Amino acid sequence: MKRTKNINRETFRKSWRDYRVAPVALAISAVFMLAGCEKSDETVSMYQNADDCSRTNPSMSEQCTTAYNNALKEAEKTAPKYATREDCVAEFGEAQCTQAPAPAQAGMAAESQSSGSMWMPLMAGYMMGRMMGGSGFAQQPLFTSKNAASPANGKFVDASGKSYGPATAGGRTMTVPKTAMAPKPAVTNTVTRGGFGESVAKQTSMQRSSATSSSRSMGG
């Protein structure tokens, strides 16, 4: 009888150790799986307007227009804002700026409205990609500068100042991090002249550093 008790105790201890190890192993696996998902990129297309999108995708004319209109609404909320037209023109160039709508009209809280009018760059294009699960499309407004001295000159940049290459027509496709399509915060305060250009320059420098680091890692 004593021997039987010893055997049962050993079996129980072994089972308990296995039971404790299994959840830990599963948890570690889950963390790695989530990390992999978070780092995964997605393919998006960039267009100057709805017609540009429709010409490239004749069967998606309705989706092109919907995404374009949604991007325009986002641009009203998230584009950099300037206290004067001159400040905006100095950053983006002549005929590239428009008066920003009042916060309430742009879908923001009325109490956040600053006194006086603000100016913002015109939307120069938009980024369009599949939403998670494939149900519909997500979009982000893109801007560009016609000022040769600006870091954003001739490039598509988003509201945060991140660059996505030449602002060309014809539907350019590229791979971007999932964060690129994440909603951007509404902008209710003005930026100083040249401030957005500094953000673009900083983001471009970070992108180059990241690309260099990735290249070195892959090279061994």
Swiss-Prot record:
A Pfam family matched in the record: DUF1190
Region (Disordered): 181-220
Positions with biased composition (Low complexity): 203-220
Family classification: Belongs to the UPF0441 family.
Protein name in the entry: UPF0441 protein Spro_4274
